[in-house]
């Protein structure tokens, strides 16, 4: 039994507890567009630009949010544009996008996602400095592989799809991460919106593409096109692997896709977005992938794959032009979405009458 002298003390303590202020949870910040880049070279401004720097500087992404991943997030509260740098490779992009999607600081339920990065380009399709909007994202990692020196004589390659019995087996399973298709109408809308954008050309690009004799598209000045991307953690190179990439993309898209660019992250990025979509945190139908050509995926005639790859390792011939193209093209789309947010928040483009 409590003694009478203790009762006032207990009541006083309880009253004090009841009067303590309750911490309020800040309202999530609404994001209109997430710009997904994969790497930066040095600082975020003032030096040689990687994929993120031009977005940081020109879109005034000045508000920094600490982010327990490869790179902090940067935001423009006036426009609602959020920029991220995932790190290179699908393991980085998948984990970064998942972390952002689960971040309670942001409301991403109506956000559009623009992947804007550089890539290798098939000289059959385009030149360095060009920009390609992808509709199909095909994964180049999920597969079986037998060394080419041990494969049956009638096999064209030792690389073949999981749960199949031979290369390009028509009895393939339904894609389980090997292929994703973006909203085709949204992709077409972005292409039409940007197809007349003038892309940079210079003497260095002209000299590089002049060696691709017999590849008319590789010798054109930079241009805008639609073309699909192959994602893989291995930086491959050469004519034989380029032929494989074309067949692999055609195989997984049932001939509807066209391999144009080679990158590392996009299937990982989109896989995370599909999981987040199922929770209602994001809309996977609001995703665009823009890849701009920094280098060719195979050497020009008369040069070996090894020689060409090692030369590219010293610096991509089209790095500056491709980084500029990614911003120039992507910013047209971003500014259209932000400028008409009263419409595009609820209705995806293209708008039908």
Q: Where on the chain are the PLM-derived regions?
A:
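N-terminal secretory signal peptides that target proteins for export/translocation
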Residues: 1-2
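Accessory terminal and edge-of-domain segments that mediate assembly/interaction
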Residues: 19-353
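Bacterial N-terminal signal peptides
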Residues: 5-16
